[in-house]
């Protein structure tokens, strides 16, 4: 265990940040999964609705500093391509 106050504080901070990061990581995965599930069953309306939500949420995470801008853009772009694919089919 830590012998210094500063080391104990760093441990507390790491635990807190790990929990926060896990929460957001799970949220990102669930958002993407929701869109992919709608695409899998070829439900265009639901997929487009969920894509709109995903776009908003992922870019909100960018503004909070959770995701990098290019990462969010890449994820949205790939989701958009999959939704567009079923919309045209």
From Swiss-Prot:
**Molecular function GO terms recorded:** small ribosomal subunit rRNA binding; structural constituent of ribosome
Please name the source species.
Helicobacter pylori (strain Shi470)
ATP-binding: is it a keyword of this entry? Answer: no
Q: Which NCBIfam families match?
A: S20 (TIGR00029)
| Name of the encoding gene | rpsT
Q: Which UniProt keywords apply?
A: Ribonucleoprotein, Ribosomal protein, RNA-binding, rRNA-binding
Q: What is the lineage of its organism?
A: Bacteria, Pseudomonadati, Campylobacterota, Epsilonproteobacteria, Campylobacterales
Q: What does this protein do?
A: Binds directly to 16S ribosomal RNA.
Protein name from the UniProt record: Small ribosomal subunit protein bS20
- From what superkingdom does this record's organism come? Bacteria
PANTHER family for this protein: 30S RIBOSOMAL PROTEIN S20, SMALL RIBOSOMAL SUBUNIT PROTEIN BS20C
Q: Which family does it belong to?
A: Belongs to the bacterial ribosomal protein bS20 family.
Q: Which GO terms describe its cellular component?
A: cytosol; small ribosomal subunit
């Amino acid at each position: 265990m830590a012998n210094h106050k500063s080391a104990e504080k760093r441990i507390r901070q790491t635990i807190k940040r790990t929990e926060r990061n896990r929460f957001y990581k799970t949220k990102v995965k669930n958002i993407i999964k929701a869109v992919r599930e709608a695409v899998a069953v070829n439900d265009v309306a639901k997929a487009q609705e969920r894509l709109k939500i995903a776009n908003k949420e992922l870019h909100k995470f960018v503004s909070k500093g959770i995701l990098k801008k290019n990462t969010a853009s890449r994820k949205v772009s790939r989701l958009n391509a999959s939704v567009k694919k079923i919309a045209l089919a």
